A protein has these predicted regions:
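Glycine-rich phosphate/adenosyl-contacting loop at the front of the ribokinase-like
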Residues: 1-72, 246
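Conserved phosphate-binding/catalytic region of the ribokinase-like
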Residues: 1-6, 148-149, 199-306
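Active-site metal-binding loops of divalent metal-dependent hydrolases
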Residues: 9-11, 131, 161, 254
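Anion (oxyanion) recognition and catalysis
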Residues: 41, 67, 148-152, 211
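Conserved N-terminal subdomain of the carbohydrate kinase-like
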Residues: 46-130, 301-306
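Structural alpha-helical scaffold elements that stabilize or flank donor/cofactor-binding regions
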Residues: 118-119, 179-180, 211
């Protein structure tokens, strides 16, 4: 199978607190780039994943998930000496909160020497996130090497900022994300992330800064406000689609997967953003990062009715 979109990062097993019983957690799956792949696959893109898992039951569950979701896991390695990552989602009046058990995980031990260079060169697009780079020094080196290799072979690259300061200090995050921006064709930042990374507090100034690194297309995720799409020629706010949200876990990943899937399918950036806004909104109407991600038919039904 020819892969449209390859993503590199860490997949994890999720335990999401139930709203009706705080003592109970529902098991699911997460990891931002894995969520991205599944969202893109549910919109019809052919996706593949680059990572490593522990030789454990959780790792096998993730492989089973990708098989069911038609995400190619050929390039997900087994690490006999490490575990697969786990995280917990809790909910309160201030929203959702994350706690991670990922130190020393299989994905964090990934190195540049393990990259599937031919698969990257053969893909249409390579996707990473700030978390892909933050989980360890070796994983960061591998991610940047993957982006450079993709660029060398004419493969487009996309980057979701996904800043997690629990994983790395701000100065290192800024240094390495600047390197990533310089290798990035399409950036999917959120306000909180990119305002911290750039030190800027104006939307257009942030877009100017990203474009100065060479980023050609920016889809600025603004939550309930929608998405601010910027090309070299045009900048436009694409309004959000409003729903009664239950859990926003993974909504940004869903947006990214849907947006990139539609770009690869040939949509212009503004049409792709309209589609992705609906897709991400629908993903917040259930609990967990993966289970509520809608299929293309559900999104298209809403778009056709507007």
């Amino acid at each position: 199978m020819t892969i449209d979109i390859l993503a590199y990062g860490e997949a994890m097993v999720e335990f999401n607190q139930r709203a009706d019983d705080a003592r109970m957690y529902l098991q699911g799956f997460g990891g931002d780039t894995s969520n991205f792949c599944i969202a893109a696959a549910r919109q019809g893109a052919r996706t593949g994943y680059i990572s490593a898992l522990g030789n454990d039951h959780f790792g096998q569950q993730l492989r089973n998930l990708w098989q069911a979701e038609q995400v190619d896991a050929t390039h997900v390695l087994h690490d006999q000496q490490a575990a697969s990552g786990v995280y917990f989602v809790s909910h309160d009046k201030d929203g959702h909160h994350f706690d991670y058990l990922r130190a020393g995980s299989a994905a964090s031990r990934y190195t540049s020497a393990q990259l599937p260079l031919q698969a990257i060169a053969d893909a249409k697009l390579l996707h990473l996130s700030g978390i892909s780079l933050a989980i360890s020094a070796s994983a960061c080196d591998a991610g940047l090497a993957a982006m450079a290799h993709a660029r060398k072979h004419g493969v487009r690259t996309s980057l979701d900022t996904n800043l997690r300061l629990k994983l790395w200090p701000l100065e290192r995050a800024r240094e390495k994300m600047r390197e990533a921006f310089a290798l990035c064709d399409i950036c999917l930042p959120s306000w909180d992330d990119v305002s911290i990374l750039t030190g800027l507090d104006d939307r257009d100034a942030i877009v100017d800064a990203l474009q100065a690194y060479g980023v050609g297309l920016i889809a600025f995720k603004l939550g309930a406000e929608g998405c601010y799409v910027a090309t070299r020629e045009e900048r436009r706010l694409v309004p959000a689609y409003t729903v009664d949200a239950l859990d926003a876990t993974g909504a940004g990943d869903c947006f990214g997967g849907a947006f990139i899937a539609r770009l690869v399918a040939g949509d212009d950036p503004f049409a792709a953003a309209r589609y992705a806004n609906v897709c991400a909104a629908l993903s917040t109407t259930g609990y967990g990062a993966v289970a509520p991600i809608p299929l293309a038919a559900q999104v298209e039904k809403i778009l056709d009715s507007k």
